[in-house]
Swiss-Prot record:
This is UPF0754 membrane protein BCB4264_A0915. Signal peptide: none annotated. One of its GO terms (cellular component) is plasma membrane. The keyword Thylakoid does not apply. It comes from Bacillus cereus (strain B4264). Keywords: Cell membrane, Membrane, Transmembrane, Transmembrane helix. Belongs to the UPF0754 family. It is found in: Cell membrane. Its main location: membrane. The chain crosses the membrane at residues 357-377. It is a single-pass membrane protein.
Length: 378
């Protein structure tokens, strides 16, 4: 009976000592949190291993994350994963669609995003671009003749329009001279002509008798204007003038119309400020609706694909610039010892408990072996 009691005692003591030793060793990883002094003498094994080596642990965790967890190869593999790409594209399409179907005005959305003075800046920049384009256009075209400056189609239209212009001028001339106003103007012209030639007027009066000169001249003028030969003559004159104009420099226009006047006229016609204001008062949905399908089905997938491709090609550079090791090191260094202990225990609680039980098991086995040795040595 004493033999079995001794074996049980040695086994139990071995298990208790082994289990408690491992439990104490685990506790000494974290406790005490701070060094303990007796006078000026620091008690050995204080503070615990992890509090003592916290800074080194932070450095090693940073290296571990960069070298073994968030590696360029691993991230690159994830970015090129087809399922990941499909999911990202779908997410982007949903988010972009929420934005472009928003019924709030562009003005409100920009103000919400703290983008100030949009209307003034947009108006100023558009007017600046238009002004620069006009100046560049004029600077180039002022070196040309009208024949070089105008497109071939314009040349054809003008040349085809000359006969019609001649007919129009003659028709208006006939209408004018048939009117009372035209007759009065013609009469004045005749009177002015003969006023400087007094004897000639008396001679003409002898031939015409009681009939006024204007009554004789008016029908002849109208007849002259209505003749085909007159039309052809006027057409030839206009054609010659057109040929002369084609050979003249566009720069001559500057003598009649200043550049700034042209710019001012264009800006006034375009009404940039009014146009920008109307545009900003539209809802995001109104602006984007015509191109919504294109944005969702083409632009977003293309942009995501290009972004992923760029990210894959530059992932190493991105990670280097992020300095992940330093970030992890700084974060771990800011942890209190208590928080660090809770963090480690939350991950390894079961494993550490099993280590304690293993210590008890080994201690018990050693105690049992000791009991058996004592039994055989008697």
């Amino acid at each position: 009976m004493n033999i079995w009691l001794n074996m049980l005692t040695t086994t139990g003591l071995g298990a208790i000592i082994g289990g408690y030793t491992n439990h104490l060793a685990i506790k000494m990883l974290f406790r005490p949190h701070r060094p303990i002094y007796i006078g000026k003498f620091q008690v050995p094994f204080t503070p615990g291993l992890i509090p003592k080596r916290r800074d080194e642990l932070a450095v090693q965790l940073g290296k571990m994350v960069v070298e073994h967890l968030l590696t360029p190869e691993g991230i690159g593999k994830k970015l090129t994963n087809e399922e990941f790409q499909k999911g990202l594209i779908h997410w982007a399409q949903v988010e972009v669609d929420k934005v472009i179907t928003n019924e709030q005005s562009l003005r409100y959305m920009l103000e919400k995003w703290n983008v100030a003075h949009v209307e003034e800046e947009a108006t100023r920049k558009i007017e600046y671009v238009i002004t620069e384009k006009i100046h560049a256009f004029l600077a180039e075209y002022y070196t040309y003749t009208w024949e070089q400056a105008l497109p071939h189609s314009v040349h054809e239209k003008i040349e085809n329009a000359i006969p019609n212009a001649s007919a129009f001028i003659l028709e208006r001339g006939i209408s004018f001279f048939e009117s009372e106003e035209g007759k009065a103007r013609l009469s004045k012209m005749i009177d002015d002509f003969f006023a400087s030639r007094g004897t000639l007027l008396n001679l003409v009066g002898m031939f015409l008798g009681n009939v006024s000169v204007v009554d004789r001249v008016q029908p002849e003028v109208i007849k002259f204007l209505g003749q085909d030969a007159t039309k052809q003559l006027l057409t030839d004159v206009l054609q010659k003038e057109w040929e002369k104009l084609k050979g003249r420099d566009v720069k001559e226009l500057e003598a009649f119309v200043e550049k700034e006047m042209i710019v001012s006229s264009v800006l006034s016609a375009v009404k940039v400020e009014e146009t920008v204001s109307k545009f900003l008062n539209q809802s995001v949905q109104q602006v984007c609706e015509p191109v919504r399908e294109t944005i969702i089905e083409k632009v977003v997938p293309s942009a995501v694909a290009k972004g992923l491709k760029w990210g894959t090609e530059n992932v190493e550079s991105i990670l280097n610039n992020l300095h992940l090791a330093e970030i992890v090191q700084q974060e771990v260094s800011t942890f209190s010892t208590e928080r660090l202990e809770d963090l480690v225990l939350s991950i390894t609680k079961n494993e550490l408990k099993m280590i304690t039980y293993l210590g008890a098991l080994l201690g018990g086995m050693i105690g049992l072996v000791q009991g058996l040795l004592l039994l055989f040595l008697r």
